[in-house]
C-alpha cells in the first residue's frame, strides 16, 4: 500500500518553490550548475548593459537589451523553479515522516529482562545497546531487535499499511522501527542505533535530499554539458571579431543571446530536478533509496535474482499428498509428518498438520504436554523435526534427509527417490520424512505460479534483463516451476553462500545484479548486489546491507524498482536529446538575425520567415526560457515507459524527442515572433 500521493502542482508547493527559486539566484547556488551559471552571468551582464544604456553611458537600444535581460533572468528562475519544485515535493514527503517522530520517554531496563527495574528516560538519550521495555499503546523509541516477548505493532506511520504486523523475538521478524506503535502485549528491545541514526532519521535525510550526491551518469552528463558550453562559448567569442572585420560588429547583447540559446540550457536546467524526482517516485512506490546512485543502478540492472516464494509463486504452499515409502502405510507417514510439524508455524508446517487431520483424523497434540525437543529449520541444515520418546523424526529437503540418513547408517530407498522425482516433475515441492535412519515417505507441497508473471518476465526479456529464480527446492521442482513461470534461469537448493557466489559470478561478467532479501542470512548477498532491496519486515542486518528498503515488504516490488530506475534514465536521456536538437532551430533563428547585415547571403537561413532581426533574437530567447517551464511536468513525472529492447527504445526516443526537439522550436519560435509583431515589440 502506498502513502498519499502529492499532486504534481500542489498550490502550497508552488508558492514555496517560487520563493526558493528567487533565493537560488545567488552566485553560490548557481555555481553548482555550470550551464545555468553561464546564463546567470549573461543575465548580469545584459542587466548592466541595460542600465548603462538608460543612463546614456553607452549607445544602444535599452528596451531591446532590457527585454533580453528580463528573459534571461526568467530562464535562470525557471530552472531554479524546476529544481525547487522537485525538492519541495521531497521535503513535503519528509515532513510527513517527521510527523511520526515524537518526543517520548522510554523505560530503559537495567537488565535484559522483562521484570528488571526500569528508569524513565527521554528517548533521545537512548544509545546503541540500551535495553527498553515497550508496552501496549507506547511508541517504540528506537530501532532495535526484540529479545523477549511478542506484540502486534502498527507500522502504518512508516509503511502506509494499516494492517498491524507481529514482531517477536527470534527469527526474521524481530526487527522493530522507531516511531511505530505497539497495539498489544509488550516487547523487550535492544536498541541497535544511536540517536540520529534511526531508520526514520535516515529516511528523512534521504528524502530531503540532504545526502543526495550526483550519480556517475549524472556526473558524466554534466561533464558533456560543460564541454558543449565551453565549445559554444569559444565559438560565440570568435564571432565578434569576425563580424567586426566584416564592417558591422554584432552587439554584446546579441552574442549573449546567441550563447544562451546554443548551450544546452533545457537539460542543464532540468537535470537536478530529474534526479530528485526519481528518488521521489521511488518513495511514491513505498521504497526508500539510500542514494540517487541506487535508483540509477536500478535502471542499468540486467540480472534480476527473484525469490520463488512470494515473488513468482503465491507463497502459500500447502501439503497436498502423503506418498509413503514401500512397506510404510500412509497413516504412519502422516502421523510422523504431523509430529515433526507441531512446532512449525510456517504455512507449510500448519498445512501438514491440517492434512493429517483431514485424511486420518489425527488430532493435533498439545505441544507442551509432549515434553519433546523441537528442532527448528535453519538455512544450513535445511530440515526440522522433533525428538520425542527416543524417536528422532525429521522432515526436510531430499539432499538434507539423504545426508541425515547416511550419517545414521541408513540407506535412502530407490522407490522414495522415484517418488521425489515424480512430485518434482509436477512442479510441487517434495519434503522427505524420516524416523531415525528409516525413510517413511514424501510430502508433496503444491504452490501456484502468480497470474500474469510469465508475461512480465517476457517484457523484462525484451528489455535485455535476465531473470533468475532463487529457490530452496530441488532441481527438478525448480526446473518445473521455472518453465511454468518463464524465467531465464534458476538456482535450486539455494544457500546464502550459493546466492553470494552467483552474484559475484554475474558481476565478474560485467553485469549489474538486483535482488531482494529480508533475513540476516541474506545480508552478505544484499551487500554484494548492485541493487539490494531489503524488506522492511526483515532484520536490521538485512536493512543495513541493502541500498533500498521496501516499506511494503513485497518481494515483487523489485520489478517495479527496475522500471522506476529505467524511467529516470530514459527521462534524462530523452530530455538531453530534446535539448541538443533544439539548438538547430535556434541556429536558424539567430544566425541570420545577427549576421545578415554583414553577410546578406545568410538571409537564406531565415527559413521561418521571422519578422525582423530583433524579433528573431527575442523569439529564440523567450522560447528558450518557456520550454523549461513546459518540460517541468515531464521531468517530474518521467517519460512514458514501455518495456522495449534497448535498440527499439533508442529508435522510439530519437523519433519522439529527437525529431520533436527539431520541430517544436521551429513552431514555437515562429508563433512567438507573430505575437511579438502583433504586440508591436518586433
UniProtKB/Swiss-Prot annotation:
It is found in: Cell inner membrane. Part of the high-affinity ATP-driven potassium transport (or Kdp) system, which catalyzes the hydrolysis of ATP coupled with the electrogenic transport of potassium into the cytoplasm. This subunit is responsible for energy coupling to the transport system and for the release of the potassium ions to the cytoplasm. This is Potassium-transporting ATPase ATP-binding subunit. It is a multi-pass membrane protein. Belongs to the cation transport ATPase (P-type) (TC 3.A.3) family. Type IA subfamily. CDD domains: P-type_ATPase_K. Mg(2+) binds at residues 518, 522. Its main location: membrane. The active site is at residue 307. Its EC number is 7.2.2.6. The system is composed of three essential subunits: KdpA, KdpB and KdpC. It comes from the Bacteria. InterPro entries: ATPase_P-typ_cyto_dom_N, ATPase_P-typ_P_site, ATPase_P-typ_TM_dom_sf, ATPase_P-typ_transduc_dom_A_sf, HAD-like_sf, HAD_sf, P-type_ATPase_bsu_IA, P_typ_ATPase. Keywords: ATP-binding, Cell inner membrane, Cell membrane, Ion transport, Magnesium, Membrane, Metal-binding, Nucleotide-binding, Phosphoprotein, Potassium, Potassium transport, Translocase, Transmembrane, Transmembrane helix, Transport. Coiled coil: none annotated. ATP binds at residues 344, 348, 377-384, 395. It catalyses: K(+)(out) + ATP + H2O = K(+)(in) + ADP + phosphate + H(+).
Amino acid at each position: 500500500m502506498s502513502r498519499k500521493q502529492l499532486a504534481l502542482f500542489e498550490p502550497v508547493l508552488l508558492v514555496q518553490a517560487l520563493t526558493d527559486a528567487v533565493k537560488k539566484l545567488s552566485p553560490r547556488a548557481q555555481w553548482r550548475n555550470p550551464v545555468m551559471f553561464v546564463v546567470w552571468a549573461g543575465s548580469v551582464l545584459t542587466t548592466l548593459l541595460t542600465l548603462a544604456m538608460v543612463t546614456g553611458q553607452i549607445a544602444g537600444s535599452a528596451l531591446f537589451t532590457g527585454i533580453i535581460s528580463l528573459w534571461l533572468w526568467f530562464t535562470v528562475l525557471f530552472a531554479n523553479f524546476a529544481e525547487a519544485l522537485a525538492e519541495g515535493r521531497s521535503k513535503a514527503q519528509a515532513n510527513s515522516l517527521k510527523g511520526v517522530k515524537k518526543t517520548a520517554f522510554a523505560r530503559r531496563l537495567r537488565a535484559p529482562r522483562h521484570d528488571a527495574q526500569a528508569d524513565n528516560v527521554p528517548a533521545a538519550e537512548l544509545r546503541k545497546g540500551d535495553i527498553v521495555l515497550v508496552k501496549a499503546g507506547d511508541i517504540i523509541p528506537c530501532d532495535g531487535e526484540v529479545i523477549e516477548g511478542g506484540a502486534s505493532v502498527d507500522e502504518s506511520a512508516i509503511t502506509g499499511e494499516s494492517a498491524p504486523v507481529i514482531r517477536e523475538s527470534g527469527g526474521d521478524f524481530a526487527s522493530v522501527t522507531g516511531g511505530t506503535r505497539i497495539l498489544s502485549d509488550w516487547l523487550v528491545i535492544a536498541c541497535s542505533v544511536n540517536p540520529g541514526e534511526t531508520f526514520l532519521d535516515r529516511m528523512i535525510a534521504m528524502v530531503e535530499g540532504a545526502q543526495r550526491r550526483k550519480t556517475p551518469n549524472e556526473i558524466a552528463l554534466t561533464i558533456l554539458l560543460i564541454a558543449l558550453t565551453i565549445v559554444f562559448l569559444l565559438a560565440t567569442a570568435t564571432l565578434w571579431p569576425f563580424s567586426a572585420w566584416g564592417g558591422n560588429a554584432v552587439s554584446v547583447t546579441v552574442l549573449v543571446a546567441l550563447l544562451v540559446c546554443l548551450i544546452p540550457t533545457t537539460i542543464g536546467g532540468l537535470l537536478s530536478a530529474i534526479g530528485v524526482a526519481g528518488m521521489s517516485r521511488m518513495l511514491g512506490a513505498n521504497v526508500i533509496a539510500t542514494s540517487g546512485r541506487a535508483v540509477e543502478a536500478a535502471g542499468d540492472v540486467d540480472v534480476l535474482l527473484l525469490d520463488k516464494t512470494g515473488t513468482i509463486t503465491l507463497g502459500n504452499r500447502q501439503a497436498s499428498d502423503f506418498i509413503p515409502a514401500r512397506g510404510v502405510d500412509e497413516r504412519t507417514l502422516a502421523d510422523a509428518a504431523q509430529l515433526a510439524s507441531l512446532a512449525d508455524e510456517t504455512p507449510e508446517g500448519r498445512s501438514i498438520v491440517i492434512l493429517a487431520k483431514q485424511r486420518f483424523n489425527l488430532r493435533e497434540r498439545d505441544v507442551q504436554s509432549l515434553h519433546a525437543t523441537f528442532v527448528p529449520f535453519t538455512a544450513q541444515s535445511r530440515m526440522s523435526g522433533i525428538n520425542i520418546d527416543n524417536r528422532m523424526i525429521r522432515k526436510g529437503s531430499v539432499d538434507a534427509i539423504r545426508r541425515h540418513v547416511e550419517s545414521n547408517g541408513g540407506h535412502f530407498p530407490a522407490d522414495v527417490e522415484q517418488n521425489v522425482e515424480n512430485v518434482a516433475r509436477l512442479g510441487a515441492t517434495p519434503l522427505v520424512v524420516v524416523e531415525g535412519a528409516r525413510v517413511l515417505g514424501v510430502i508433496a507441497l503444491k504452490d501456484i505460479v502468480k497470474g500474469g508473471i510469465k508475461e512480465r518476465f517476457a517484457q523484462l526479456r525484451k528489455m535485455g534483463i535476465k531473470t533468475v529464480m532463487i529457490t530452496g527446492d530441488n532441481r527438478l521442482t525448480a526446473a518445473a516451476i521455472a518453465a511454468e513461470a518463464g524465467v531465464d534461469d534458476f538456482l535450486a537448493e539455494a544457500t546464502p553462500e550459493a546466492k553470494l557466489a552467483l552474484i559475484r559470478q554475474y558481476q565478474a561478467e560485467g553485469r549489474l545484479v538486483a535482488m531482494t532479501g529480508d533475513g540476516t542470512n541474506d545480508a552478505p548477498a544484499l551487500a554484494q548486489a548492485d541493487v539490494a532491496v531489503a524488506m522492511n519486515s526483515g532484520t536490521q542486518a538485512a536493512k543495513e546491507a541493502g541500498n533500498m528498503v521496501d516499506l511494503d515488504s513485497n518481494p515483487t516490488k523489485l520489478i517495479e524498482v527496475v522500471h522506476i530506475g529505467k524511467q529516470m534514465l530514459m527521462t534524462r536521456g530523452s530530455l538531453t536529446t530534446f535539448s541538443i536538437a533544439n539548438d538547430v532551430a535556434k541556429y536558424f533563428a539567430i544566425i541570420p538575425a545577427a549576421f545578415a547585415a554583414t553577410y546578406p547571403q545568410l538571409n537564406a537561413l531565415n527559413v521561418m520567415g521571422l519578422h525582423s532581426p530583433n524579433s528573431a533574437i527575442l523569439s529564440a530567447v523567450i522560447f528558450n526560457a518557456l520550454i523549461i517551464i513546459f518540460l517541468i511536468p515531464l521531468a517530474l513525472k518521467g517519460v512514458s515507459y514501455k518495456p522495449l529492447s534497448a535498440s527499439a527504445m533508442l529508435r522510439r526516443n530519437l523519433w519522439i524527442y529527437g525529431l520533436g526537439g527539431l520541430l517544436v522550436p521551429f513552431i514555437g519560435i515562429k508563433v512567438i515572433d507573430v505575437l511579438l509583431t502583433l504586440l508591436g515589440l518586433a
